Every structure is written in structure tokens, then in C-alpha cells.
Amino acid sequence: MPIIEQVGAREILDSRGNPTVEVEVALTDGTFARAAVPSGASTGEHEAVELRDGGSRYGGKGVEKAVEAVLDEIAPQVIGLSADDQRLVDQALLDLDGTPDKSRLGANAILGVSLAVSKAAAESAGLPLFRYIGGPNAHILPVPMMNILNGGAHADTGVDVQEFMVAPIGAPSFKEALRWGAEVYHSLKSVLKNQGLATGLGDEGGFAPDVAGTKAALDLISSAIEATGLKLGSDVALALDVAATEFYTEGSGYAFEKETRTAEQMAEFYAGLLDSYPLVSIEDPLSEDDWDGWVSLTAAIGDRIQLVGDDLFVTNPERLEDGIQRGAANALLVKVNQIGTLTETLDAVSLAHNSGYRTMMSHRSGETEDTTIADLAVAVGSGQIKTGAPARSERVAKYNQLLRIEETLGDAARYAGDLAFPRLEAK
């Protein structure tokens, strides 16, 4: 039985140059593992709380308090526990924090320990992380939802939609899907250059041109796909992360594309997009607390497209259960740092799958070189992963880990492809 012997922590930098927490765990059998915690730019109101230092250091974003929480409070509580009992370890973390939103110790401190323990236990068992968490049947490689054009909170432009993604659903393998996505990415750069548009990058590696709006951006990406010789729709589909909470104001509605719109008008806009473009997924099309709007939208177009709750659910089993009962959305975005422990993340995924909801594993805009979510995507069979453009090493690290996993699985590997999107309509 591998016992936790040492727990260490430090402040490191994420991909935006902001501090984050890294945790190291050593077991009595000599096993060692490390995990780094990501952070988001557009964060949901209901997410677990990151502990930041405040003050002038790092503009108030330092995490020395979270590091101290790991070293002074968490370590004494988990040292001596069995690393292979993840639920026991995570419950000890929750009990120690004692708040519903992890605000005392910080979700960044708690998650770092939770993930490092799981990685150490996998190492001790001599298993890849995806196999340790997912068991012998974990074999589905996810469709990479590549954010190749950035807007919203991820870019300083007038584009309101936060992410425009390509999904290589027609590829025969993850390796080929990655190639297709990379070729479309480079093709888009050429399309932008030819039109005199900027090719600077946003937080997640996608281009951030200042284009007229949603349809103009989708047209650019469609042209880039077709320029590679791939078929728009059957080979490579499109997806959006609207992040609508960012432009919603209670009482006045959605300030979208120079108009103030109601939830019903937003729904009409999305229905129009479905008629014109091969979209397979829309994330956060409405605000995180617009439950009535979500229910109406799901009833209107939920049989035609995947509607993903990110800010709506914040990977929280309780909010997800509420949404399932109401009939809001039909898919869950999974971000481990939104909820703060591996166990709660796995519980949310299980609830989603058992309720007929799809799941999409996701990074954050502030990432590190940690590749845990790549293993998690395969472990839980999510069939979809969102980890940015095929550029910037903190994004590519996850894609490269999935290449390794596909190679490890050999003939047992299966690429999810269009089966990840059962609502897909041929266009």
C-alpha cells in the first residue's frame, strides 16, 4: 500500500505569466509525482475559489498563501494516508477546508495535492495515468476541439464569441486528426495574411484578428479548411465557445454584436448559424444563471447540436444535477480546477454520462506544461478535448501526450471521430 510520505509546493508561472501552484508528492515506496494547477480568464461565478495573495506583488495574483496552505495545513493531514484511496484523500482535503467553495485553503492548493497524489499512485502502480484512473477499458482518443481563432476575453478585439474551434471528426485516428487541425491552423494564417488581417495570437494560441463578427470569423475558417483540400463538415466541423456570461447584464440582456438581445433572440441567431454552417457544438451560448433561457434553447435546438455548459455547471455535480432536472444543455465541460478535486471531477463526469450528457475535457486559458487532462480525457472516455490551438507549448503538450497514449494503446486505440457528436447533421 503506497503511503504519502512527503508533500511539497511552490509558486510557478502559468502561460500568461501569472503565478500558480505546483505540488509534489512522495510516497514511502520512493515514488514521486508533480502536478501544476491552471487558471481561467473567463471564470464562472460559481467556480471553486482560487486563493490569491492580493497586495502589489505580481499585481495581487501571487499564490504564496496557497503554497503555505499546502505546506502548513494540508501536508500534515494527508501524510500517512494511502495514495491509492483517492476518495479518502480528497475527502480529507474537503473536510480540512470546510467551506462549500474551497475558499479557506484555496481550490488551487487543494487541486494541486489531489492531482499530485493520483499521479504518484499511478506511478507506484506502474500504470499510465489514463489506465490507473480509467481502468482496463479506457481506449477512446478524443476529438481535439482546436481553438484556432480567439475573441472575447481571450483577445483584445471586437469579436464577441470567445473561441472558434475546428473539430477533425472525419479523421481515422487521433494522429491524423492532429495533423488535419495543424494544417487548417496554418492555412488560416495564410487566409488572414492574404486579407490583410492580423496574425497575432490570443491566450490559447489561436489567431486574434479583428473581424466583423461571428459569421465573418466562421467564413474565414471555412475558407481555411477548404484550402487544405479537406471537406468542410464531413472531415472538419466547426464549434463555438460563446462565453455569453461575459457580455450579459442582468435586467438588460446580451450586448452581442452591437445589439442588445434577449435569450430568445440569441436562440434565433444560433438557429440561423446551424442552417448555414456545419456546427457540432456551442459552449455557453447563454449566461450562467439564465436557466429559463437555457431550457428554452435546449428545447429549440438541442436535438440538432451539442450545447455545452461551462459557466453554467462549473464541473459541479450539484449544479449539473439541477441542470439535468430542468433540461438545460446536453453536455458538460470538464475543468478540474472549477471544482477542485479529482474525485468531484470524476463524479461530475459519471453523472453526466449516466444522464445522457456528453462531456468535453478542457484546459484553462492560463495553462502549464502539465498534461493531466490528456490522460483524464481518455480515462473517462469523454470523446472530446479542448486544449487550444496546435501552437504554444503549454497547449501542444496535451496533444503530444495524447499521441503517446494512442501509441501505447496500439491496436486497442479508437478515435472518437463523428461518434462523439450524435446530434451531427450531415451538411
Curated annotation (Swiss-Prot):
Any one GO molecular function term: magnesium ion binding
GO biological process, one term: glycolytic process
Enzyme class: lyase
Cofactor(s) recorded in Swiss-Prot or TrEMBL: Mg(2+)
Positions contributing to Mg(2+) binding: 241, 283, 310
Record note on cofactor: Binds a second Mg(2+) ion via substrate during catalysis.
Biotechnology section: Binds 2-aminothiazole antibiotics, which are antitubercular drugs. This protein may be a possible drug target.
The protein's Enzyme Commission number: 4.2.1.11
InterPro entries hit by this protein: Enolase (IPR000941), Enolase-like_C_sf (IPR036849), Enolase-like_N (IPR029017), Enolase_C (IPR020810), Enolase_CS (IPR020809), Enolase_N (IPR020811)
Binding annotation for (2R)-2-phosphoglycerate: 162, 335, 364-365, 386
Cited Gene3D superfamilies: Enolase-like C-terminal domain, Enolase-like, N-terminal domain
Residues of the active site: 204 (proton donor), 335 (proton acceptor)
Organism: Mycolicibacterium smegmatis (strain ATCC 700084 / mc(2)155) (Mycobacterium smegmatis)
GO cellular component labels: cell surface; extracellular region; phosphopyruvate hydratase complex
UniProtKB keywords: Cytoplasm, Glycolysis, Lyase, Magnesium, Metal-binding, Secreted
Main location as per UniProt: cytoplasm
Any matching Pfam family: Enolase_C
Protein name: Enolase
Compartments, as annotated in UniProt: Cytoplasm; Secreted; Cell surface
Role description: Catalyzes the reversible conversion of 2-phosphoglycerate (2-PG) into phosphoenolpyruvate (PEP). It is essential for the degradation of carbohydrates via glycolysis.
Pathway listed: Carbohydrate degradation; glycolysis; pyruvate from D-glyceraldehyde 3-phosphate: step 4/5
Family, similarity comment: Belongs to the enolase family.
Reactions it catalyzes: (2R)-2-phosphoglycerate = phosphoenolpyruvate + H2O
